[in-house]
Amino acid sequence: MPKLKVKAGKGKKGKRKKAGKNEHRLDKESEVERARSNAALWEARLKVTEFSRVEYRDAARSLAQNNEDLTKQQYKLEKDMVEVIGFLKKQDLEKDELIEKLQQNLIAQKKSAQDEREKLVELYSKQIAHLEENYSQKTNEMQIIQSEFKLMREFRRQKVELEKELDEVKESLWRANQDHKETLARMERRFFEEKQRLEKEAEKKIMMLAEKAHSEAIIQLDEARKSVFKENVRLKEAFSYHLKEMKDIKKSKKMQEDAKLHLLQEKETNDLLVQEKVSQVSQKKVQIQELQQNVKALECALERMTMEMEKDAQGKEHQALLQEQAGNVELQKLQKVLHMKEREMNRIKKLARNILEERTEVESFFLEALWQVKQEIATSRNYYRQVAQSAYTSKMIQASLGKDQYPKIRTFHNKEHSTNDVSHDLSEAEKWTHIQAGKVDIGDLTWEQKEKVLRLLFAKMNGFQSRKSPGLKPSPPADVSSIKEKEINTSNLEEKPEESSSTFITQSIPELPAPSLVLPHIQTGRCQVTG
């Protein structure tokens, strides 16, 4: 009896082992299917992003082209504006020069009018003086006559006549004086009126000033010069009229000669065209006869071809009916296959949705871990900087007291040209020189190295292939669930700085302050982290 019990127990254990193997196999198959669906999903996302990138590039190119066209148009408009402004300035300068010339002419006319007025005044003053001299002489003569022939009868007889003559002379002198005054006043009034009129006309019609001044000069000339000038003007007009008639006659003669040559050429061309048309008509008659014969032959061939085409059409209709029936059968098959594919795609979509929901939980876990590591890096870096600065100041104080030697100069502000800065010590925390080849515990790593491990795991989970450094051979990372307990290979940890920012595609990390490096111990290359 005891032997039977033992055998029964062994059979149960074997069944349990087989069931465990089957479950393990099913888990592996489900993981493979998940990986495939994940890969297909990310390929679809990659295609969508690539398509959107091409569209953005085309849009940017079109915007750049539009910007270039607008720049060229603006340059052209500015150039045209500059040319127009230059042309207007040139016209203004020409108008200013013309105004200046007219003003000079006006000044010259005024000066000439003033000279003529002075000459007239001088002339009339001379005439008045001469008349006064004559009057004085006559008066003296009359006095002499009166004194000498006072007693003479003849003087008495002539006295009345002489008095009359004297009155007439006085009256003539008075009239001459009045006429002179009137003419002088009229000339002055005319001069002022003419001056005002010239000033107004110079403001309104500058171009007509020369003609008016010319006409005034003609009025003030004497009759002989005026007649000569008028005759000169008339001859000039007649000469210009005859020249114009001569030119018109020459033009009409030339036009008639050209028309004659043109008519002769047209006659020659018409004769040639008539000859060509006659020859063409004869050729056309021959061609018409040949074409009529060809038409008859083609009609016969067309009748034969129509009969053959009707036979071919009947055969093709029968063949098309057969192909249509076969196509309907094939279409029904394809519809069934399409329905099956749609059902399969729906199942794949549900599976992908479930996978994404599971991945979001893992992503949030790793993002929280990354944020915590960055916080630890920042606190460790600040703590080391404070400790190093206090140690440096204490050494400087001791050296100033003569108890110890002066230390090397050290900076704490991460300057560009500093040779001994705290950041140089902090950069040692990212190096892997203190780790030997083989396996190492995750607790032996610095916070910076832990951050790189997490980012490398992100890249591996998202399907990215990181660029390894040539110094270490690559090896697969450890399991994510036991990352804080198990050991990982250090060859997977060395990567370039640009890959340290890898993260999930489905999520975005908020911008945090740039993480500082944790201070490594200079002798051992290990991190000294304090809580």
From Swiss-Prot:
InterPro entries: DUF4515. One of its GO terms (biological process) is motile cilium assembly. Pfam families: DUF4515. Disruption phenotype: Cilia in multiciliate cells are motile but fail to produce flow. Multiciliated cells are present in the normal number, cilia of normal length and of normal density. They are however misoriented. The keyword Thylakoid does not apply. PANTHER family: BASAL BODY-ORIENTATION FACTOR 1 (PTHR14845:SF5), COILED-COIL DOMAIN-CONTAINING 166 (PTHR14845). Residues 1-19 have a biased composition (Basic residues). Belongs to the BBOF1 family. Residues 20-32, 482-499 have a biased composition (Basic and acidic residues). Signal peptide: none annotated. The keyword Cytoplasm applies. Residues 1-32, 465-505 are annotated as: Disordered. This is Basal body-orientation factor 1. Basal body protein required in multiciliate cells to align and maintain cilia orientation in response to flow. May act by mediating a maturation step that stabilizes and aligns cilia orientation. Not required to respond to planar cell polarity (PCP) or flow-based orientation cues. Residues 26-213, 274-365 form a coiled coil. Keywords: Cell projection, Cilium, Coiled coil, Cytoplasm, Cytoskeleton. Multiciliated cells. Induction: Up-regulated by foxj1 during motile cilia formation. It is found in: Cytoplasm, Cytoskeleton, Cilium basal body. GO terms for cellular component: ciliary basal body; cytoplasm.
